[in-house]
Amino acid sequence: KGKRKPRSIGEIVKRESIRPKHGALLFRLTNYFKSKNILQIGTTMGLSTLYLTSYATGLRCIALENVPEFATIARQAFAKEGRNPIDLRIGNYKDLLPQALNDINSLDFVFFNTLYEQHNNLWLFNECMKYAHNDTVFVFEGIKASRKMRELWEEICACPEVTVTLDLYSLGIVLFNKKLHKRDYIVYF
């Protein structure tokens, strides 16, 4: 009693991975916007990365992960699916992000799977925003998971560069298209 039982990889994957309907949405978004330069911050063992990159070949994806054990599982998943061109980088996000942004140069799609990085999220958003263009899409996971994440989402919605936000309760989608009027939508998903 009181001892923690070690969890199996299957239990960890089930708890930490993206839900299938959210993964399908990521696939549809990257497909619809024809994203060629994708950045993922936090891989959740690679499943969300596979959703992001499965719509086409010839795209560039840099995935950042700060948990080495998750990165090992992600790398195995990429190899199993034949997705070796995914550039997986392991380490602290604050150290990895500047070089990743410099390498990718222009962001088409960014998936922030950074629920456990709440203290860095605003910095990550602001750094990525410097490389955003009119057709860039940002997706945040866990926007209602905690008070800090809700506050972050409110700050993102208030950002003047952001034109449209979609609050899907557990996911948040951010658009920067200057042709669109500033709107914040709440959508049941």
Could you describe each region identified by the protein language model?
Residues 1-111, 115-139, 143-189:
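A short alpha-helical cap/connector motif
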